[in-house]
Amino acid sequence: MAHVLIVEARFYSHLNDMLLDGVRSALDAEGHSHETVTVPGALEVPAAIALAADSGRFDAYVALGVVIRGETYHFEVVSNESARGIMALTLDGLAIGNGILTVENEEQALARADKTRKDKGGEAAKAALAMLALKEQFGIG
């Protein structure tokens, strides 16, 4: 079984609790172990994954957070740069499921975070496991 690190940006804690519930449920259902670390915001998620990868303790990673559009350009910066950082790590061979929601409003975030609705947390966990399986299929790991 895999050992998975969940990296969560807690800026919107009530929404992240929902995402985290979905991730943990998906991993527990498959019998995988997991740990969770918290970072201040979505921009810090890729750095935390990179640091954890250097430890060699984890097989896969799940990135969690919520970015809600506001009145400034900050939304674009955080959304684009966090996604770019995660993509760079995946291209370096890490198995990562990206569960950082980028939405227009809290209603959209609630629909996506709730595991009884869109369950984007659970989907991110399954994506990480799928990428780990692909690595194993290619004999990488």
Curated annotation (Swiss-Prot):
* GO CC, alphabetical: cytosol; riboflavin synthase complex
Tell me which UniProt keywords the record has, alphabetically: Riboflavin biosynthesis, Transferase
The pathway this protein participates in, as annotated, is:
Cofactor biosynthesis; riboflavin biosynthesis; riboflavin from 2-hydroxy-3-oxobutyl phosphate and 5-amino-6-(D-ribitylamino)uracil: step 1/2
**Cross-referenced InterPro entries, in alphabetical order?**
LS, LS/RS, LS/RS_sf
A GO term, aspect molecular function = 6,7-dimethyl-8-ribityllumazine synthase activity
Q: Which residues bind (2S)-2-hydroxy-3-oxobutyl phosphate?
A: 71-72, 112
Question: Is Transferase included in the keywords of this UniProt record?
Answer: yes
Which residues of this UniProt protein bind 5-amino-6-(D-ribitylamino)uracil?
11, 42-44, 66-68, 98
Q: Which family does it belong to?
A: Belongs to the DMRL synthase family.
Q: What is this protein called?
A: 6,7-dimethyl-8-ribityllumazine synthase
Q: Which organism is it from?
A: Sphingopyxis alaskensis (strain DSM 13593 / LMG 18877 / RB2256) (Sphingomonas alaskensis)
